[in-house]
Regions:
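Mid-domain alpha/beta scaffold segments of enzyme catalytic cores
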Residues: 1-258
């Protein structure tokens, strides 16, 4: 069976509480053998780490999302550092900048993002980035920290090929989610065609951003196959080969040893 790695999901969130075991069964039947659950604040980070520890093939990222930056306190960094020592914790994230919702002041978002980037450098862990309507500021921060970047993933990439090239120059992987399957996404699809095959990832961001043909419904990791199918078709390569490539890329991005 073809094996898939959903590089970014939230299957540990409450929206799956009523039928999580059914979701996990569907994932196994669909060949989604590995997946990463991603924290967004201290509570969800702790929960993601615990969830990963209890589920084979599951890994965790821990960190403070830009929406939650306003609640950050200095002690959070030490707690994240302590939790990072756990075997299934493979990244800091999701961190970054979100200027679409602006749920935390932009200066606060920047400060908290940079503090966690520095923590990732100290821990030598990759970073899972959430970036929305903030690519230039994020790139400026990354370039300032260029000597201390640890690599990682631009999750749910939403920019153009020109923007993707800037992240690639800094050594990041580019991850595509459901929006790449949408009909009105030519710039995103152009990026998906051009990102080098050794730097491309797939994800669902479940329960959000369900791809075609299930758009509008609760998303789940099983649907990562639709993302893989779309990009493989755009690139005119066999689906099985693309699944194998993105599996290895995710293992590389998260420094997961077989």
């Amino acid at each position: 069976m073809m094996a898939l790695f959903d590089s970014h999901c939230h299957v540990d969130e409450p929206k799956f509480d009523d039928d999580r075991e059914d979701v996990l069964t569907r994932m196994a039947e669909a060949g989604v053998t590995r997946y990463a659950v991603i924290g967004s604040d201290m509570a969800t980070s702790r929960h993601s780490a615990d969830f990963a520890a209890a589920h084979p093939g599951c890994y965790a990222a821990i960190g403070i999302h830009p929406h939650e930056a306003k609640g950050f306190v200095e002690d959070d960094l030490q707690r994240l550092a302590d939790w990072s020592k756990e075997e299934k914790v493979v990244a800091i994230g999701e961190i970054g900048l979100d200027y679409y919702y602006d749920l935390s002041p932009r200066e606060t978002q920047m400060t908290v993002c940079e503090a966690q980037m520095e923590l990732a450098w100290e821990l030598l862990l990759p970073v899972a980035y959430h970036i929305r309507d903030a690519h230039q500021d994020m790139l400026d921060i990354m370039k300032r920290h260029k000597k201390h970047l640890t690599g990682g993933i631009i999750h749910c990439f939403s920019g153009s090929w020109e923007i993707a090239k800037e992240y690639l120059k800094l050594g990041y992987f580019i991850s595509f989610a459901g929006p790449v399957t949408f009909k009105k996404a030519p710039k995103l699809q152009e990026a998906a065609v051009n990102v080098p095959l050794d730097r491309i990832l797939i994800e669902t961001d479940s329960p959000y951003l369900a791809p075609e043909p299930v758009r509008g419904h609760r998303n789940e990791p099983t649907n990562v196959r639709y993302v893989a199918e779309k990009i493989a078709a755009l690139r005119e390569i066999p689906l099985e080969a693309f699944a194998q490539i993105t599996m290895q890329n995710a293992l590389n991005a998260y420094s997961i040893k077989e």
